Regions:
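Glycine/small-residue-rich interface belts in oligomeric ring/scaffold proteins
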Residues: 1-32
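Internal, well-folded beta-alpha domain core
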Residues: 31-196
Length: 196
């Protein structure tokens, strides 16, 4: 199997490390990532995520995100609503929509066709993966960024339905939904990136 993650993140007071929370900003971020392994120049085997696409709901995040990272952020419309125990997140411009039940429940069944035997096994693929990678084709360099997270507790949720037009552009053969988790209140920062 190969695994692709669609991460939807509501940030709070996002700012460069060392800056006061007062100047932080709240953004909604969407990341499309593929699970990878990379052997660095020292011979160390690193597990992480390779960036396929990144989106945000604010131009400010696109501007500064593309200065400080190689995540290639684009701004899109993002709509969120909660009604009758169901969260809906969608974008007309980006062509995605998903609906999940708000209740976190260990007894939620895995999605049909999931390659995992149970949620315990599925959690091993819910991170946190320490590294994020981007590749610069022109310079043939890999940027490696290590993220540091605390309180990472993935809780299973039931995904009612979903559609992401971007995933269709990847032309994957018979993709299946492997799992769906929600993770809340994560203190998070990135270490300075390294280029190889």
């Amino acid at each position: 199997w190969a695994f692709i993650a669609v991460a939807m993140v509501q940030t709070k007071a996002l700012r460069p490390k060392g800056f006061p929370e007062l100047i932080g900003n709240n953004f909604f971020l969407i990341g499309y990532r593929v699970f990878v392994r990379y052997t660095n120049q020292a011979g160390r085997n690193l597990r992480g995520l390779y960036i396929l696409k990144s989106e945000t709901d604010k131009k400010k995040m696109e501007f500064f995100g593309n200065i400080f990272t190689h995540y290639n952020y684009a701004t899109t419309d993002i709509h969120q609503s909660t009604k009758d125990g169901i969260i809906e997140i969608s974008s007309v411009k980006s062509g995605f929509k998903l609906r999940v039940e708000t209740e976190e429940d260990e007894n939620v069944p895995l999605p049909p066709g999931s390659p995992f035997a149970d949620w315990k096994e599925a959690r091993r693929f819910a991170g946190p993966l320490p590294f994020t990678f981007t590749y610069n084709k022109e310079t043939k360099e890999v940027l490696i960024i290590e993220g540091v997270r605390q309180d990472w507790t993935p809780n299973p949720i039931k995904l009612i339905d979903y559609n992401f037009d971007f995933l269709s552009t990847l032309k994957l053969e018979n993709p299946v939904l492997a799992n769906a988790f929600i993770i809340k209140n994560i203190p998070y920062y990135w270490k300075k990136g390294k280029i190889e």
